[in-house]
Amino acid sequence: MPPKARAPLPPGDAARGEKLFKGRAAQCHTANQGGANGVGPNLYGLVGRHSGTIEGYAYSKANAESGVVWTPDVLDVYLENPKKFMPGTKMSFAGMKKPQERADVIAYLETLKG
């Protein structure tokens, strides 16, 4: 499922992305090293990881079998409309329509690595 060609995202601001994450994603996801899964999987180390690979989380079949690697470009398309990108995903989030907000969240997610 490689993303279609699209305009590049604007530069992201990780601090703004952290605020957006806490306001829109932290209800379901944790983002700390070794953190427990919530309603959704822990997103620490997400960028560069294969989809469906966090131990102990019950992924949807669509997610577990997608073969997706979470690159910034893939995350951009996914975060815009998760259900369109990956039909069958368990993620109930409707998506982020503003490119700057997606860029900011992706910049934050890129900081979450050991």
From Swiss-Prot:
Entry GO MF terms: electron transfer activity; heme binding; metal ion binding
Post-translational modification: Binds 1 heme c group covalently per subunit.
Source species, domain of life: Eukaryota
Taxonomic source organism: Crithidia fasciculata
Family: Belongs to the cytochrome c family.
GO cellular component: mitochondrial intermembrane space
Lineage: Eukaryota, Discoba, Euglenozoa, Kinetoplastea, Metakinetoplastina
PANTHER family: CYTOCHROME C
Function: Electron carrier protein. The oxidized form of the cytochrome c heme group can accept an electron from the heme group of the cytochrome c1 subunit of cytochrome reductase. Cytochrome c then transfers this electron to the cytochrome oxidase complex, the final protein carrier in the mitochondrial electron-transport chain.
N6,N6,N6-trimethyllysine: modified positions: 4, 83
Record's keyword terms, sorted: Electron transport, Heme, Iron, Metal-binding, Methylation, Mitochondrion, Respiratory chain, Transport
Name of the featured protein: Cytochrome c
Compartments, record wording: Mitochondrion intermembrane space
Binding-site residues for heme c, renumbered to this chain: 28-29, 91
Modified residues (N,N-dimethylproline): 2
InterPro entries the record matches: Cyt_c-like_dom, Cyt_c-like_dom_sf, Cyt_c_1A/1B
